[in-house]
Each structure stands twice: as structure tokens, then as C-alpha cells.
Amino acid sequence: NEIVALTIEAKKDKLMAGYFIWGDINLEKNKINIPKRNIIELPIPVQIDNFTFESLLIQNDEAIVIFEANGRNLRSDAWQYSISIKDQKIKRISHPNIEYRINDVTKLDENNTYWGINYLWEGDLDRLLPAEDVLLSDYQTQGIVTDVRSIERLAEFKINNGSIV
């Protein structure tokens, strides 16, 4: 049997809620089994409508659950949950502040590097309250980019000594 892991975004009593869910896949029967005990509600770092844990990254026996909003004005001390697939122990690992949303991530490569889709929709500006976009600052200084209302780009991350950089 293979393991399956998911994140679920939901509303609970008008507040956002995020869940980590795991189970196994029976390839012979073409079925996924997720026992009720394998549903963990994860406290949301900051309440923003329609923002929870959008991405999941597997490193060895750990599932890293990535919250969408990690900007400086929302989370001065950004972090992500890391959950042991073996015993479900939960810890926090540091994460860099990055403005806008992280919508999805690639799998880790052999150097513990991955890429995330870093996305801004103009309608999210009031909810995200973005600080200076350090990934764009060089372009803005040179006058290449002046007015940013939407962005869709790849951002590179690396797991190094138990932290995301």
C-alpha cells in the first residue's frame, strides 16, 4: 500500500480552518482509505478569508504543510507546520517572508530545493497588505516595473538545516 496525504481548506463557524489528512492507497482495489483518526485540524496562523494551507511538501518522513500568506505585514515571524508521517508529531519550521500567495509547490529535488507559485490577484491586495516586494525591488529601482497589481511567478526555496530559506 502507498500513502496519500492531503490538505483541506474549509470554513468552520465563519472562520477559515485547515486540515491535514492522510491514509493509504490500495492499488489492487483502486481505493483510498482515510480513517477518521487521520484528520488533524491545524490552527491557522492568521485569519484571512479563503486562505489556509494550500500546498504540501514531502521530505523523507515529514509532510510540510505550507500556509498561503507569508508576507511581512501579516506574519512577521513566518513558519510552516512539519508533521511526522510516522507518529503525527507536529513542529514548526521557519519560512522566509514572501509577499502574496504561495499557491502550489513542486516536489523537492536532490538538493532539497523546490519552487512555489507566488501569485497576486489584484482583488487580494486589501487582504494581503503587502510590504515591499524584495523579489521585485531591483526591477522597480531600475524602472522596469512600476505599477504592480497582479503577479504570477515562480519563487525558489530550499530546506536547509531544518528551515526553509
Residue ranges and their predicted role:
Residues 1-165:
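Sequence/structural signature of beta-propeller domains
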